[in-house]
């Protein structure tokens, strides 16, 4: 469950390390984002010579949340951290690699490029 002011790790090699959610997209009163949702983020920490720099405002897809994700079969999946992948305006990832596992729920939200780059899909 991601809301405004939530700090997230970045799970790709775009050059950002930490980002802060500044808006949850999808409706004027929408408060929370879950896995697969698109949010607007501000880069809070970045590595030198990366594709992005500190202070940039970008869109990102939430790929891991510490809050439980309920599946239709009754099982529950949760992660140790909140993480996102930076995307461009065409919803393509900016980085060329994804770090860490991502859940199957991204497939239902049509983030196939992230699924294909991920080392493990849970």
UniProtKB/Swiss-Prot annotation:
User: Which InterPro entries does the annotation name?
Assistant: Ribosomal_uL14 (IPR000218), Ribosomal_uL14_bac-type (IPR005745), Ribosomal_uL14_CS (IPR019972), Ribosomal_uL14_sf (IPR036853)
The Gene Ontology CC terms held by the record are: cytosolic large ribosomal subunit
Question: Which Gene Ontology BP annotations are present?
Answer: translation
Among PROSITE patterns, the record links this protein to:
RIBOSOMAL_L14
GO terms of molecular function: large ribosomal subunit rRNA binding; structural constituent of ribosome
Q: Which UniProt keywords apply?
A: Ribonucleoprotein, Ribosomal protein, RNA-binding, rRNA-binding
Function statement: Binds to 23S rRNA. Forms part of two intersubunit bridges in the 70S ribosome.
User: What family does the database annotate?
Assistant: Belongs to the universal ribosomal protein uL14 family.
What does the record note on quaternary structure? Part of the 50S ribosomal subunit. Forms a cluster with proteins L3 and L19. In the 70S ribosome, L14 and L19 interact and together make contacts with the 16S rRNA in bridges B5 and B8.
Q: What's the name of the protein?
A: Large ribosomal subunit protein uL14
